[in-house]
Amino acid sequence: MTTTWKEEIEGEMEFYGESLSDIISSTMSEDQMNIEFNNSMNAVLEGIPFTIWTESRVYFPVTYDTGEWCGSVSRNPDGKPTAHIGGG
């Protein structure tokens, strides 16, 4: 399946009540966010690495069996454990 980091990031942000307008800092340019890549399992890793910060979360790429998507954690200590990222 073809996607962009913008689509993947927006989906993760929406889950936490955020949007792209909440970004404080990003290691990716807007052009890089819009590059299409194949995020299917057993495909070649194609998405570029990134880190994005908002007031409340930090967003980053996650991979499992070469499937790629966006994950995030709280920017500040919240007492909630982080589940294993990238696998079942």
Predicted regions and their residues:
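Acidic interaction surfaces
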Residues: 1-88
